[in-house]
Amino acid sequence: MKKTATALFSLLLAISALNAQGQTKTYDISGTVVDSLSSEPLPGVYVTAGSKGGQTNGDGHYVIKNVPAGKVTLKTMYYSSYPTATREIELTGDTTVDFILAEQIFNINEVVVTGTRTEKRLAEAPVLTTVIGEREIEKAGSVSMLESLQDNIPGIVISPNAMGNNMRIKGLNSRYILMLVDGERLVSEGAGGNVNLDQIDVNNIERIEMINGAASALYGSNAVGAVINVITKKPVHKFEADANASWANHNTWRTRLSAGTNLKKFSARASGFRNSSDGFGGDGEGAYAAAYEDYGATLNMGYRPTDRSDVNVVGRFFSHETFNPTGSMNASHALSHNLSLGANGGLSSADKRNSMRLSVNFDKYFDYEVLEKKNDTKNKDNTSSYISARFIDTFIPTAKWELIGGLEYNHEENFATSTLGATPTTKTLDDANVFAQAEYEILKNFDAVAGARYTYNSQFGSAFTPKLSLMYEVAEWRFRGGVGTAFRAPSIKELYYDFDHQGMFWVYGNPELKAEKGLYSSLSAEYTEGLLNVSVSAYYNNINNKITQYDVINAAGGNEKYYKNVSSATLRGIDVTFSYLFSKHLAVRANYSFCDAVDNSTGLQLEDNVKHSGTVSLTWNGRIARSPFSLQIAGRMNSPKLYQQIITGSDGSQTVSMEESDPYSIWKIVLVKPFRINKHTIEVTFKVDNLFNFREASFVDPGRQFLIGIRYAFK
């Protein structure tokens, strides 16, 4: 018995010793977090160490207790204007780790991809790129992507017409502006090339990148006037979620939910939104906007089998329904759906010098007529679809060279019940592309990028579009220059339209149309010194073979409309940007644009062109209850919109009709106040838009509006 007890006691001692050896020691990590500019402590910063974390107090001090010894990665989480800071340490005892966080005022350290299809710091990008970041969108209280663009890019004009909201930038309409989401093209929804930007959830935008001028060498057709690429948010935490709700005049509601996860090999993000409004006007006097109801949902999933490979899938759905005003005699209203599906995968070599990516994307637009007197039966009027497949290989043979080559195939299809002929008809277009680009560091601070694309289109044949960009950097100056070509393929509607427009006129397409060709050149200088950033750029854009619609009076006196390649246009202008942090609290941004956009066949300005335009914002970044807030006053100013045309009289004489809108400026004031408690953030937004209640016949706006919004986020 005694021997048995002794053996049991010895066994217990051995197990205890083994447990003691197996237990990982834990230590505390502490430190302070301060602002880089003011050196003031930052309360409310959440610092994580794996699954553990701690939040800074009023003195900027934090403590994370019982962190297992070994390699530890520390991360800060604060308001979006302060980027996440990361520190890796080897924890062998109680340790002090301090952080100095810099609030990002400029975007020069932002990583961009649109100008070269490769990741570059904005300051190092050879192609001049405009970036609208998440923090600018939040501080401006923007509720839509369109508002974000108007707040930051001068010269954007929205002109409602029978084909939707036509967006013009520097005299060129939607046909010449290529819209992308994460590098993939959005299908246009009408003959005007319009894209409903409300399908993009503004709360899901990480940043918006825009490059001006010809970019067909990388992106193909339509990249004539500008390329706008929306980069969506990716999950960064093990679990994150947020919810938004806002209300504005005319019973305008915007609500949204999202959740995401980022694990070792798997990531996913799902979001959904509902927007609605009672609209305004409809009495025949003044501006009018229909009541509407929108729904949208997005799902992104990614898998990383190894640190050198990844596979991603994305799905997006959007529904937009507009309603007739009270008392309307219309027996139907419009409904549209957008569906996008995509997948891509990448593989890189062990030394990261070579990487390949294959992507496939499908985007389809459905147009319905809802028959109100037939139990809201839906009649499908039109569909537009776009399928794109792309392979890209990026190779970095030396530190001075970066090479890109790729293949691309695109298939476009339109179905219409009546506009492509008297019977339901389907028309298609295909194009195959090969493209290449080489970037070379000629000297230490002198880079050159040359690229070209060859396109074979099933309708008009071949197009070759080369491009060259240069950048030279000296001290605080960056000089960029470039020349490039672009093309716009005629749309299916311009080629094959054949319909009677409610007895008022006939519209006929022209299958013999050729592609429009553009030649773009630009020079720019950028200066950055401390808290000041200024840039000046000049450009010249000449577009030939411009497709124009013209009228013919037939023998019966009826009006017939046709398309032909008869005109050309020349755009020349100057853009100026200015950003400065006057103190640790006040940030000032201003943008000015001059654009002379001439239709060379008439010598007149392009329709809706605005010669002078600008945007300005003053943002006060202060503190309430020792936590930050922002107060912004922002405005956008436009000279008159120009409407010029030549009218031919019955005797053959020609007169020039010239009309213009009033010049205008639209101002808003926005207060954004976040509250942070550990991993939780509550943010309240108050906004007064169109502060001075500007109204004008050509300007579709309900006048002064008030908005209140609230957002909750967990990370």
Describe every region a protein language model picked out.
Residues 9, 260, 302-304, 484, ...:
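Conserved C-terminal beta-signal and adjacent last beta-strands/turns
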Residues 65-66, 147, 184-212:
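Short acidic/polar hinge/loop motifs at secondary-structure boundaries
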Residues 129, 146-184, 188:
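Extracytoplasmic beta-strand/coil segments of soluble accessory domains associated
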Residues 329-350, 382, 478, 485-543, ...:
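Outer-membrane beta-barrel signature, preferentially recognizing the C-terminal barrel domain
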Residues 441-447, 540-542, 564-644:
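Gram-negative outer-membrane beta-barrel transporters
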